[in-house]
């Protein structure tokens, strides 16, 4: 099968099962797996939308403990004996009584060959309706606060009618608003400079009285009983009260001197929000949505002092360990994040500020709980408003497209072991026969808690081969390795759902089996390696991570490229490997690994989003797409992400996922400024100027978070966003005859892709020669 046909096949599998694998044939021994360099791994999107898939309204049929695998199309079913054999543990299980009428031609949906992904609605109802607690920073300008209030009031109409809503505001003090008290505005005030233990918060709010016990089901349509009902009200009953409270919110009254920052107790407000939910709603779906317009400057978790002369920490400060508040703040927010994750609650962080707000310190609140992270210049921006509204997108049945209190478990056959997960989750510390010896990401477990999950939430799951090799390793007949992903989550409709995806792939034959190399998915592999690199970058030095990326690339090319000794020009890669070095070139230059010109908050935001998206979107972040428009061609033409693509008579459309940029070449910009497009006879120029705008609108239509939209001309200051992403094949040092500077010239010392590839070929051939010499003359 040729590469294009394989790509189509992998794309069909992704549409059906929401999964892409780095290798689509598994090596049969651990030794063979170690020589692959790129680990066996999957990018899995559990809730990928499948509108044509039925929702089964009965409990799944599971294997006996401890296996607990769910019945799937790969199970052997004996319809006469009414038994099925589990493909994971090979145990025989009786079919339940309601399967008595099945025959070879009439089988239940979960056994259909195309039902490798199936969803069940479980009988267990959710313990409470979805909960939304808005935590609002009042230390901001009037116009920003008004815009935020308007957006929050609008969001009330997007919530399910039975959803519970609470409100906490903070500035110098944190206030929990008692929405259930209608006589006048009433709130409980917490001092911003003091750290409160969980029990203190509960005592002060009067939450220790008998309330709904954890995991005790309530009617999903009924308001909660108990003390928390004073602070959390159903939208349908209290929309008027909640709207009134929001409308009456005022700026923090505490005076701020010109040389000071506002006193902002973000840590106390978050601590109170977590304490409020964990007392009465353990393991019930809830979101704490934080809206902050500046850094925390007092109390636990503060990231900078109130004096403006004291700057926010930079990457340089962190590298030199010149960070006064960083470690203590991280410890505080990480402890809060673990509490929220253990209770199944999501924390979303929405920042509306030109300066840093402390996202770096707070990042694990979102990373541990599956929350959203959004970085915008102001709450007045359309980027914030439209992105926030998209959080509440709904399906065809008017249910929110978000899952609550989610968990993921992975089962494997004896050939495979799970080594870990990289994504927005925490370990459930569940041990089983599927857990591997090594660790990659969040390891030593086969189950993780994600809390918040949506249709684009994706996770990198990594595996190892269990078989050590030897004569007994290769067994006669076709062999396969299997994995099953079990995603439990609270659906917005009020029931728990289970989505099951079962994947089977063939095992390779003896060493040197060509099907192994042919099964390599370079796009999935690039994204999975990028996740590992970003995971390493959070704990290691940047240059060390880039060296690791380079080493892995050299090893992969040494293993799979064709070349002759001492002849770099003979270097060749198969079609399904050719783009991989290019992806790695752009990854090592990207904002995920290069922190220069980005604040620590921006770096935390970019890495957060990369770890949330599937293969297609993550690849756009690593290697942006570039399209060209000109009068010679109709529509857009994909072009190389290279400085040579800049032409005076062309318009370029760059998509980096975070930015959508329209770039006008010099001549086009001059024509536009002269107004030719408005004159008769120049309709083709007008259409040319409009085409990239229409394509940009399509790109923006369903993207979260909403990208920043930039229109610029050659030589303009905003053109730097384009130039920073292009391969610098034409720089000030490689100019043509006379050394003249053109619009294609990029002033940089970065190496070009061609130089990178030349060095790669030399290293690969040298490494191969060195390995051969070492084998011939082993070191003593």
UniProtKB/Swiss-Prot annotation:
Tell me how this protein sits in the membrane.
Answer: Peripheral membrane protein
Gene Ontology process terms (BP): COPII-coated vesicle cargo loading; intracellular protein transport
What compartments host this protein?
Answer: Cytoplasm; Cytoplasmic vesicle, COPII-coated vesicle membrane; Endoplasmic reticulum membrane; Golgi apparatus membrane
UniProt entry keywords in alphabetical sequence:
Cytoplasm, Cytoplasmic vesicle, Endoplasmic reticulum, ER-Golgi transport, Golgi apparatus, Membrane, Metal-binding, Protein transport, Transport, Zinc
What GO molecular functions are on record for this protein?
A: GTPase activator activity; zinc ion binding
Main subcellular localisation: cytoplasm
Q: Which Gene3D superfamilies match?
A: beta-sandwich domain of Sec23/24, Sec23/Sec24 helical domain, Severin, von Willebrand factor, type A domain, Zn-finger domain of Sec23/24
Superkingdom of this entry's organism?
A: Eukaryota
Matches recorded under InterPro entries: ADF-H/Gelsolin-like_dom_sf, Gelsolin-like_dom, Gelsolin-like_dom_sf, Sec23, Sec23/24_helical_dom, Sec23/24_helical_dom_sf, Sec23/24_trunk_dom, Sec23_24_beta_S
Binding annotation for Zn(2+) = 63, 67, 86, 89
**A GO term from the CC aspect:** endoplasmic reticulum membrane
Family, similarity comment: Belongs to the SEC23/SEC24 family. SEC23 subfamily.
> What job does this protein perform?
Component of the coat protein complex II (COPII) which promotes the formation of transport vesicles from the endoplasmic reticulum (ER). The coat has two main functions, the physical deformation of the endoplasmic reticulum membrane into vesicles and the selection of cargo molecules.
What is annotated about its quaternary structure and interactions?
The COPII coat is composed of at least 5 proteins: the sec23/24 complex, the sec13/31 complex, and the protein sar1.
Q: Protein name, please?
A: Protein transport protein sec23
Task: List the source organism.
Answer: Aspergillus fumigatus (strain ATCC MYA-4609 / CBS 101355 / FGSC A1100 / Af293)
